[in-house]
Amino acid sequence: MQTTDDILDLLQNVKDPEIPVISVLELAVVRHVDVGTDGKVVVTITPTYTGCPAMDVMATDIKKELVEHGIASVEVKQVLSPAWTTDWITDDGKRKLKEFGVAPPEKTGDIRALKGEAPVVPCPQCGSRNTVMLSAFGSTACKALWKCNDCLEPFDQFKCL
């Protein structure tokens, strides 16, 4: 019989369909894994935001990964509380976002945000802080489009939620 740690190891293979370098564990959408005495596995996930179109794909991919590794009974449940926050993204996940060319989110408790000031978003390509937001809407709803004024590269920023 599989253990919770075995399941977590398998879930590391399930990637966010919109950002394929980060796993559902690194993104921290997996909230809980329960392995029943009958072998049934229940994985509880929380959407990054209400209506996130990737959640159905993630749920399907989670089931597929576990079934392919011999787990016959899998259920994926979604919970909305507590609400997901970018603060939960792991340090490895943030590093992978940056290496992929997406500026990782700052902490939501950033004092500049609390004061209503514009965020300072370092360029994931060259590290410059001389950047400007081009659009609050990037390639997906959870990202904004920025440009570096030094290396002139456009890049996505994972919005703080």
Listing of model-derived features with the role each one plays in the protein:
Residues 85-100:
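Short, low-order "capping/linker" segments at domain edges
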Residues 97-161:
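Cys/His-clustered metal-coordination modules, chiefly Zn-binding fingers
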Residues 21-46:
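Short edge beta-strands and adjacent turn/loop segments
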Residues 49-73:
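Short, non-transmembrane amphipathic alpha-helical segments
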Residues 76-82:
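AMP-binding/adenylate-forming catalytic domain of the ANL superfamily
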Residues 1-27:
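N-proximal, solvent-exposed amphipathic alpha-helical segments enriched in charged/polar residues
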Residues 11, 30, 52, 74:
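Residue-level signature of catalytic and energy-coupling elements of molecular machines
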